[in-house]
Amino acid sequence: MLISTSLKFLTMLTSNGFGGTNPPKGMPYPPTYLYTEEPQNECCCCWLCRLLCCCSPVDQTASRSRMNASQPPPGGGGRLPDEVFRKITAVDQGQSTLTQSGIQGLSARTLSSEPRGDLVFQLVEIIKKPGQSLGLYLREGNGKDRSDGVFVSRFGDNSELAKYGEVMRPGDEILTINNVEVSMMSIDDVVLILSIPRRLLLRIRYSKSMRHEIISSRSRESERPVVVFHKYDDRRDSETNAPILSQPTSTANTWLGKKSRQQMEEMRNATTSSTLRTHASTSSPRNHFAPRLVNGHSHSIGVPSASTTSHDHQYQRFASEPSDSVSRTARVPPPRLASATVRRTESFNSAPGVSTSAPMYTLPRSSTAVPPPDILGSIPYSARDPLMRSSADLPYDPMTGRLSSSVPTDPLLSRSLCSPILPRTLRQANDSNKSNSLPRRRIMTGGRNVKWRNDVVSTSDLCGEESDGAISAPEYSSPPFSRLTQQQQFRLSNGSPGRTVNDIFSAAEYRNWAGPYDPRGMYGPFPPGQRATRWSHTYGEQRAPRTSSLPGRTVLAQSLVGSPVLPRHPPPIVQDRPSAVFDRYHVSPLMNRRAPLRAAGPGINVDRLSVSSLTGILYVHIVEGRGLKIPEKQKGLTEEMYCVLEVDEQHRARTGVSTIEQKFKWRETFHIDVVNATVSNFFVYSWHPQFRHKLCHKGSLKLLEAFVVDQLNDDRVFALNLEPRGQLIVRIGFHDLQAVFRRTVNPRLNGVFGISLSRLVQRERRDTPIVLTRLIQEIEKRGVDYSGLYVLCGSVEKKKMLRAELESNPLGTELAAESIPDTNVIACLIKDFLRELPEPLISPQIHGMLLEAASVALPNDVQTNRHLVLKIIDCLQLSAKNCLLLVLDHLSTVLCSSPHNGLTPTRLSLIFAPLLFFCLDTFSPYTISPTSKMAAVRTLDINQASSSLQMILSIWPSRVNSESGSDSPATTCQKGGVIAYVSESQC
């Protein structure tokens, strides 16, 4: 009884498309999802997740036919043949010892095995709960010599089937399922067949040699030894000549100093006799666990022997120098960030232009800069200790009474402790993919005061790059000409978890390490009163030095509204970006200051700006959600969520559904036309086809504050904090009216969008463009009472796919609801067509005439006003006039359903007035007569254009039916009637 009820419920789901093909009113269709997880066409066998679209979204280059989310996949879902369904049900209702024994959960066994040479044919029985996932991934072909057939790709995480040993393994081919041949079926059909029955009989085939090869290869991967590779990393001379530290850190009083003293003691004992050295080299536990060293050609590097007495003597002298105290020999430069392919290391061997043929070592992090005894003879004595060079080479530091080195040329002092151990001049200089959240230098005026931030989202996180320094590292501004750049930064911990600055450096040592430096011994390239800003490195530029003090809020606000501000420093050589005024005062959107900030924005007086809202096109790309959680009451019902975007409390866009297996990666883009927008809200809802959707998370973003740093024309990535928990990664961009309505011509002459109307209708031999006519007719065919029409935005990805097909085949493109279920995609294409015309449908000259007509129109004489407006419209070019009549008739039809779609004349005019009137016609503006009291035509004034369009719509006649033969306006709006263009006179 339970099995038959489940089968009926499943049949109802698959036949109805999860509750019907139409979404609830006011909600666009969710995006389409393919049933493939990887490029190898893997497929998960979780039927519930598959039916509720839990797999990866459709690629932008997929065919248009896959945009229909309400239909089952081709060949699957509700289109399984009845014969196949009967075979599945017959085997499912058969008797089995596993079902009779009452085993709960998933169970599997091998019923028969028939070896045929290298191939083995097995009959496998699997008993599972209805709808239970097998945790199995399928693919088409084996990835080697076959491209057809259904093969097991891999097991999922915590797969129950993987615990049954030799029943089924990756690489096996599935021949039949419940006596149904599946070799020539699609992966979607196979997944559906596996999800329906409770009892499965699978006939599989595998190769013994291939299965053994797969098992052995996986075992070898799990037992990989630790190997340290040499990596060549070429660096510029400017980097190698720049000092790491003019005052090296003294670690005598820390755990690092203790370890260095232990190392020194061991080395002194090792020099007493060769027997002790040999014994120490063979019995030291460090040697047993030390990583094997290989060079760039994968050849092992042997440990050289130290047998010469000269080397022993030199090493003994080096280790026993009276001036070589522990506080000096334990000086270790702070760690640096290596490339992304190797571990983070401390560099000890980067002498510029110096190469040595002596073998190189890798030392543990706790070791000192004392070199081994066998290579001391091959280098000068001054190069062994950079602190004991001649005064001719090193400047004298009057503050410390010692010689300071600004350019370390010692080939031993840049030796890597883990991975890259070649000189820096031989390594690659490609460090563009490193973390941007490691400690950087800043002048420390007070005592120890490290501010740890956890609200900075690194760009590398969005790119999928891992950086262990991005977890807990303070922010310091770095000089642009030093080795401590944005790409090469230091790590405060030694790699062990839980260590902080207090465990590594004392207070004096940390101030010495993080303090200012100078190539001449005291200061760096910036004097004590100057520094480089970390915000200036956002665009990879190097700006002029500027002060560290933030100017008054009034001065900054005046500079934003256009008041001249005298520069306090010479202008930079590099041309400033739009955010130069903020860079000049070291203003960052992620403020790290102790001064109190206003809640209005990131240290900026937004009230003094010249704009208070945004009007233009808002580009919103919803990337993914992090830390999202479905409420406890909803966990048993659904695991899918979608995001809703509101602008000024108005519903404007909605994403498709996504699951936790997809890590809630929506990755959908929307182009939203906004008028005086100030706030955008993001709501995350749980989705279920039958139950009410529940609000799970919400967040808000003030648009003006998001774009004020880039002066309103740029895009940024935000990690928006949601309530009660989680983050939403969004990229938001904005283009103002000047950038949107440039009215440029499409260079593709055979295209449809962005082509002159006269050229387009002449080529198509039609009165109106084919694309515009078909799109309007399709919307009217579906009904103009759709809530959210022309307000909700369709997905940009779907819109691009449909637009590409219309460009290539305007007449043959399928626009029915079965192919394009989202009406918002079609509505957005209509607006794009009008927006991208090289010239507006209503030119500025005609607009000026309409303004004069509005000034002399009589309030109660509709017929006279209509006659006047139609005479003005007749002055347009024939192609523009016919297209305008088509659009105005459509808008009049839309207004007839205003109680249902919520579009009032004012709201509809704000949407379409910019599309019909706006342009950048600043060369020959229309000037009205001197006697008129009307103002001049403003080509980008949305209020003026909206009032003109409202006047036209208020007197526009209703659509007439050409079959009636009457020229009188119809009393009702005819949706299916043929358009009869009204033209009462000619100019």
Swiss-Prot record:
Segments for region (Disordered): 266-334, 348-369, 424-446, 463-497
Compositional bias of kind Polar residues: 269-286, 427-438, 479-497
Ranges for domain C2: 598-722
Record's subcellular location: Synapse
Any one GO molecular function term: Roundabout binding
GO biological process entries: activation of GTPase activity; axo-dendritic transport; cell differentiation; cell migration; cell projection organization; locomotion; nervous system development; protein localization
Pfam families, A to Z: C2_SYDE (PF25336), PDZ (PF00595), RhoGAP (PF00620)
Annotated site residue numbers, Arginine finger: 791
Start and end residues of each Rho-GAP domain: 755-949
PDZ domain residues: 123-209
Null mutant phenotype: Worms exhibit an irregular shape and fail to show axonic polarization. Uncoordinated movement and retention of eggs, an egg-laying defect are apparent.
UniProt keywords, alphabetically: Developmental protein, Differentiation, GTPase activation, Neurogenesis, Synapse
InterPro entries documented for this protein: C2_dom, C2_domain_sf, PDZ, PDZ_sf, Rho-GAP_regulator, Rho_GTPase_activation_prot, RhoGAP_dom
Tissue expression per record: Expressed in the nerve ring of embryos. In L1 larvae, expression is seen in the ventral processes of ventral cord motor neurons. In adults, expression is seen along the dorsal and ventral nerve cords, the HSNL motor neuron and more specifically localizes to the axonal processes.
One GO cellular component term noted in the UniProt record for this chain: synaptic membrane
Functional description taken from the UniProt entry: Probable GTPase activator for the Rho-type GTPases by converting them to an inactive GDP-bound state. Regulates the localization and assembly of presynaptic components during presynaptic development and is required for specifying the identity of axons during initial polarity acquisition. In these roles it is thought to act cell autonomously downstream of syg-1 and syg-2 and upstream of syd-2, possibly as a positive regulator of the latter. Required for the control of movement, egg-laying and the correct localization of elks-1.
Protein name, per record: Rho GTPase-activating protein syd-1
Originating species: Caenorhabditis elegans
